[in-house]
Amino acid sequence: METLDAIQLPYLGVVGASLIVILGIILLFPLGSDPFITINQHPRDLFQTKAKQQFEYNAAALLNEGLQTGHSAFRLVTNMVTYLILKDQYAEEIKNDSRFGAHEAVDPVLLVDLPGLESMFQGSLHNQVPPMAVRALNKELVHLTPSLSEEAMNCLQTRWTDSTEWHGVSIPETVLALIAQMTTRALLGPELCRNPEWLDIAKSFTTNRAIAVAAVQSWPSFLQPVIHWFLPPCRALRRQIQCARNIILPALERERRAYCSDQPTKREFSNLVFIDQYAKGARYDATMAQLRIIAVAFQTTSDLVEKVIARLCKHPELIEPLREEVVSVVGNHGLHRHSLRKLTLMESVMKETQRLEPAVIIGMFRLAKEKVTLKDGTVVPKGTNIAFANDLRFDPEMYLEPETFDGYRFQRMREDPAKIDLAPFTKTRMSHLAFGHGKHACPGRFLACDEAKLILCHILLNYDIRAVEGSPPELPGSWGNDVGEKTAGD
């Protein structure tokens, strides 16, 4: 037996080593030719570690490198998955194509099947409910504008005070607080929108979730269903969710009792009630429902408002024309939703900021559910994750001097019959994919637009702003601002 073991063990070692070598060769030199180049592919980068790090630190440069190749599609290894990056010219063709799944592309990347990262419904309902809830909210925005305005004013007075002296403030912290208070007012009503414990959760949940996802994704996929139980960011996230449950579930019970009461009172829209009724008795997680919507809503809106304020500090010549527009519109029409639509210069500044500095550099994610041949003959294999390059936002045929910030750009488009459809902030086009495009375009963009305008209205009417000397206003999140209360004579 000893002799047999002595023979078998080295033999098994040789076989194992050979299998590893063969596997490495297959991974490095896969069978069949790939028609798409991979921008950040490196020899002997067996687990794509170098490629992922390269994307993490130089994503924009890699994307630009891919666009400079002249190919209409190329692969890009990211820190999540490898995407087939398509130029925006394909967006119109793919936007409503059912062969490409939106949720199928996003859910695995966001790890929605893991506890603490999960969705609120079992099965397909978890992807149906958030858009339905937000669309229902959109119908109520005309009634919610005064309440949202009140919360914006309250938050600014609390954080920026009524002092007429110049003083430093943190724009990222202010904007996050504003979006948390206003969005909570829209979704959950007046009871929770000034609840400090809930607002702390609302402000930090999206970041905490992203940290937890990154921690899990740093491990091999076959270990992820187990390792998340032991990772500190995931454990902290689950504790935060439990704190949220202690707030949301009692609030839901109060809403149910009020809705079922015999008193025929007119109640404001409540996201809690809408989702509860939409579920029709199906088992669901009311807390995760709200946290999921918050996770989506906060990022885009807060990113936009921060960058617009940064642009105003970098281009102070825009502040007075914007202020005059607000004074004229609000003076003649009041601060209502229909009057917000008349703020065309403000919309132009917002959209131009978003054009040059979108929240993400690639977007409109899809997964090919089957092999798809596009109209120009490009073949997208089944199972391919695709994303769009946002390249048309720099198209000189679409935008004159596209690299230059022009706050009046989209306002002028309203005077051009050929381009008037491009002007509205909430309009999606293949040349402006910040909110996606087609049937999966972001349904929350209307709330985001209203919140951003209300915040800017209150800032322009009540404060003067300027960048702190030496700070880079083009970098939201890393710069501070000086702010002073406007006096009555200004």
Swiss-Prot record:
InterPro entries: Cyt_P450, Cyt_P450_CS, Cyt_P450_E_grp-IV, Cyt_P450_sf. CDD domains: CYP503A1-like. It comes from the Eukaryota. Keywords: Heme, Iron, Membrane, Metal-binding, Monooxygenase, Oxidoreductase, Transmembrane, Transmembrane helix, Virulence. The chain crosses the membrane at residues 12-32. Heme binds at C442. It is found in: Membrane. It is a single-pass membrane protein. GO terms for biological process: verruculogen biosynthetic process. One of its GO terms (molecular function) is monooxygenase activity. Gene3D superfamilies: Cytochrome P450. Its cofactor is heme. PROSITE patterns: CYTOCHROME_P450. Its EC number is 1.14.14.119. GO terms for cellular component: membrane. Pathway: Mycotoxin biosynthesis. Belongs to the cytochrome P450 family. This is Fumitremorgin C monooxygenase.
